[in-house]
């Protein structure tokens, strides 16, 4: 008999979760997920080892090409304040009163969907000097930020919209200054084209002039109506937070939409793109691969190990052979996204050596697909992943991200300890099969214009 403990047994295909039986002891006090209303969930996680607590609300909604720029600016405007604290000065003062609590608002991607998030982190009620009810204060701020924005005559404050539109314009212009980021985004634009996964997270520079207080309010209303809402609480009274959340939702008409299904771009003949920039000292190479829409993509655990072996660690093939042995690049890494079926390899090389680096990268990938993989290199690469999972328990934000990632992928919730079990169970054949599923699709090269190359070096310019 194990007190206060529930048994959960999940059965899944071998390919997805590495094991036929997933057996997990899940203590109620450590992790519990409840549905409060259609499309509204709350997940409570233990934070016993921390003196701080955290409340986060995630709104996952379908991305729209027509309103992508409004959504990007909206996140910036919401972070400035809400009805009870209508400007940044009042909001900063209120957070300072709560022993220096931290508030953040962010817009991110979940495959073809978008996620608007607001989080607040501060000390627990136990440590309040005067016995204040900090949980209610935190919930009031983070929910106020999302559900009670500061409005002027029913629309967003024109001055706040003007300021944050200019801020977003500067952010988009700055993309070109980071050539690595610029190359990756240019490659993704060619790769995804007009597909839903290709909608720009930061919006479009030419459409910022169309952002108005009224258009922001229309996008805000659409998000509240269609979003699936997940609240994640750590170290606070879940019941009090849930009660306040439901009261905030009482006056909102809701029609939550299902999550977008995983998608992948179709396999196509390889396309090469080259862009020349005067005076560039380090060329950038971004190579994108697609699974072509497999109905049963590899599990996240398999992809993590596969990317670590290929180019995601200091013991990977690309790092050891392309960077160290052949000295063909300053950096060379790989990453994969299960929801869109894309694998990316990007590197920084000397101008003029892009083709040589590309050939070496493809040779290493081919070697992993069809050549031998030793257990030693698997274990070396796996060791870093296991260490990073151990570190998750040292951060409230990292733990929350771990569990919300599982929610976005439609997986059962399991702790990092079981993630280590799944990672340790990944086999050589599973890594090979995962890499074999990718087909080379797009190569984007940002290099120096002939006759203008700099001296070369590690600088990202």
For each predicted feature, which ranges?
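M16 family metallopeptidases and their MPP-like homologs
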Residues: 43-45, 51-71, 88-144, 148, ...
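A conserved active-site cap/scaffold subdomain adjacent to cofactor or substrate pockets
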Residues: 295, 300-312
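An aromatic/glycine/proline-enriched structural segment found at the starts
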Residues: 197, 201-207, 222-294, 453-461
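N- or domain-start disorder-to-order transition segments that initiate the globular core
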Residues: 27-54
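Short, polar/flexible loop-turn hinges at active-site or ligand-entry regions and domain interfaces
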Residues: 81-84, 126-129, 148-157
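Short, positively charged and aromatic/hydrophobic N-terminal segments
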Residues: 6, 10-13, 17-27
